[in-house]
């Protein structure tokens, strides 16, 4: 909620977050194999890999040396009739020209996706870099802003996108309730046999309906417990990281 998103799902790594986020966006928006996503040439491998793994095509844009982010003039040049999204991945938390990229996306009907693994908490003109993103990922690897030993998260204000991401991370299961929201006092799911899955008229056991070709990317309870404590220290950690950057930059 702090970063402007109402829906999130935790997974076992930032790389997994990117994988299920791209899969969810492709399915939700109906992108086709071979559709293009513009990415920065300087970044981590698992920003790029999920694009290819989901049958899409990465289109690379070179960087500018002052911030290691994409050359905005090249972004304009790389747009084609098959471009569907721009996938930002701010290097070392350096803010990019958000005004220009948002204008570019609006003019060309493109979605802005944010790989926030390096930039959790980074701002541009007072706004978090994820403000205009249709979906965003973050990583809880030890070297990043928050640590859950390993872990990641997908966030979006489109509930269906997060539901799909959760399904892809939970084996592709059609039943993806959050936490204990539908549990009875005895711990049994109170809606397990209800008629609430789209496309299924008969009463079925939702636990064994798999609508996607999914994965097993669930986090451990321990990771969530560590993360809940780390959240309390986020401002402190962020302040220390900014201090360290100023010392070496």
Predicted features by range, described:
Residues 1-36, 50-52, 60, 127:
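Phosphate-binding glycine-rich loop
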Residues 10, 39, 154:
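Conserved SAM-binding loop
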């Amino acid at each position: 909620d702090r970063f402007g998103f109402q829906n999130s799902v935790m997974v076992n790594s930032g790389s997994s977050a990117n994988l299920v986020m791209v899969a969810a966006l492709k399915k939700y928006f109906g992108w086709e194999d071979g559709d293009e996503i513009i990415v920065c040439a300087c970044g981590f491998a698992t920003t790029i890999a999920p694009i290819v793994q989901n049958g899409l095509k990465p289109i690379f844009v070179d960087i500018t040396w002052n911030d290691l982010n994409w050359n905005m003039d090249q972004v304009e040049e790389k747009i084609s009739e098959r471009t569907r999204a721009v996938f930002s991945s701010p290097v070392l938390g350096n803010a990019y020209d958000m005004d220009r990229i948002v204008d570019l996306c609006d003019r060309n009907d493109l979605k802005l996706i944010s790989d926030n693994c390096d930039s959790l908490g980074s701002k541009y003109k007072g706004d978090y870099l994820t403000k205009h993103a249709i979906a965003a990922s973050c990583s809880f690897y030890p070297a990043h802003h928050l640590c859950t030993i390993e872990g990641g998260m997908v966030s979006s204000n489109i509930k269906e996108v997060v539901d799909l991401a959760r399904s892809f991370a939970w084996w592709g299961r059609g039943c993806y309730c959050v936490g204990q929201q539908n549990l009875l006092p005895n711990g049994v799911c109170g809606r397990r046999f209800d008629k609430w899955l789209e496309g299924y008229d008969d009463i079925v056991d939702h636990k064994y309906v798999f609508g996607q070709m999914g994965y097993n990317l669930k986090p451990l309870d321990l990771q969530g417990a560590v993360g809940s404590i780390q959240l309390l220290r986020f401002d402190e950690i962020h302040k220390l990281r900014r201090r360290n950057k100023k010392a070496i930059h």
